[in-house]
Amino acid sequence: MTEAIRLSVRYLPDLYLPDKAIDLLDEGASHVRMEETFALRQNVQAFLEQELTDAVKTSQFEKAAEIRDKMQKMAARFPDARKSKTVTASDVAWAVSVRTGIPAGRLSEDMRTRLLNLEKTVSGQVIGQDAAVQTVCRAVRTGLSGIRDENRPVASLLLTGPTGVGKTELCRVLAKELYGKEDALIRLDMTEFMEKHSVARLIGAPPGYVGYEEGGKLTEAVRRRPYCLVLLDELEKAHPDVAGILLQIMEEGVLTDSAGRRVNFKNAVVVMTSNVGGELKTEGLGFQPLDHSDRVMESVRQRFQPEFLGRLDAVVCFKRLDSSDMERIAEKYLEQLKSRVQANGMQLNLPEKLAVSLGAEGKNRGGARSLRRIIQERVETPLAAFLLTCSKKPSKIRCSMENEEIRFF
């Protein structure tokens, strides 16, 4: 009962006590009964099949009749076994997970421990952006600690910096850590809303227009999954009217769609990314040893209105990646390639200097996305050609580098 009250207050804020706690107990009890009934039927079926098979093989028809009687007695005892089951905290967590989409295990996990370890977990997957990760995790931790304004989203963040430095990757990792799955990330490309008439698609087309029954791309996605991370990519390319919609979300935590339904953003993390300030560079795209955060912030203040910036919980500047960061990212991509090859029943051995060479080339040509393309051109394409020329599927694949040329054998 205590767990039902705690979880209902935490994850079902739009409903009221005691109804929402009672509903969770009812759904948990139904879940227990369904699982128990299924397990008992499976046990009875396995028992009867084995016993009857043995009796028929040995022509023991009297024993077969006894098994039939035993079956009836066991079936009569099943209701008593179901009544003896109790609803546990894990059953209540399962009921909440069905409504919110958050895995049941995370509902029962210690929230305090998870938030304290958030920076360490995210930093291990987002390379070279420790300061940005710390700022984002601090804002999210404050929003989930219970002291935030309940009428606002968990956090409203603006991530700025050049392309290919990890802004989108950070959002993907954060969504998985907070809500258990990467599909908790609702991503909208703001290049689709550059025209004034396209802004209405966020909340739904007006009555009489095409697409009115479909709902808004933003409001409908959040209405179906209120516990999510909303990512608005490349915000500076959107029409200025989009800012008016975001002001209401960041201040009130709700938005009314074209059908008159109030969509709740109070349990969502709202993240906007921008490449404003990305032109402040003297080297290749995405890399610069100097810290230009002050100049980036000045560009942000010139691009966005003060009332918009004033409603943000944090403006996070992503730094340009250096050679060591690129080498670590190359190692990460190569490990992913090894995993894909291993999934096909083969083992791929790569030299250590390959990551160093790819990282140096990626630094000269662009950010992490360019590095991914370099790996595809220099490693994946030759590897695919090598596999096609093999008459038999190899168990081990080795790689060598001579004069920056990669060969497989």
Q: What are these language model-derived features?
A:
Residues 1-409:
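AAA+ P-loop NTPase nucleotide-binding core of proteostasis motors
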